Amino acid sequence: MTGVSDSQAGPCLTHEKILMRRHGAPIAGIDEAGRGPWAGPVVAAAVILDTAQLPEGLNDSKKLSEARREALYAQITGTAHVGVGIADVARIDRDNILQATLWAMWQACKALPRTPSAALIDGNRCPALDCPAEALVKGDALSLSVAAASIIAKVTRDRIMAELAKAHPGYAWERNKGYGTRDHSDGLNQLGVTIHHRRSFKPVQAALQQNALSD
């Protein structure tokens, strides 16, 4: 597993073509969503694009509006091969967030309906896959396949958090998606820690200690 760097702006198929020359087709892009939040799972997605049906406007999910992400999600799932992996809070707390993320990426690649010849991974670490993998820092802004994976992972996780918010009102997960915002912090202080909070994360540990002192 090796790393790749590139200064080119905007996602394209350059890195996919490089890997195709080395390993053949198809190439999967893999990305994750939700490493930093205090609550909820980390979600990874793997995408093999159909280069004859590329959705217009693919980009890093963080640069797109929610409405645009939803529209692209529908286009990607309608034209590409997609796999999703979800590491729950129990796995995050047991293994740590990095290992849980790598496991989710492995699950996402394994869930693809077509086996990739190689994979591009967003970031600087590669999971252990059944195919060659290369890490690409800022891959979601450089590779169309990774950008597509970032959209699938982000939309999937946002939908999960919206559902969890219905069962656990008061933490504003429908807005903050489990990230450490002021309204989430207020919810922790007022309502306590839920089963969906990551107890290995320091802000959640602090809330547990504070709640114990208050009892």
Model-derived regions, located:
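RNase H-like, Mg2+-dependent phosphodiesterase core
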Residues: M1-D215
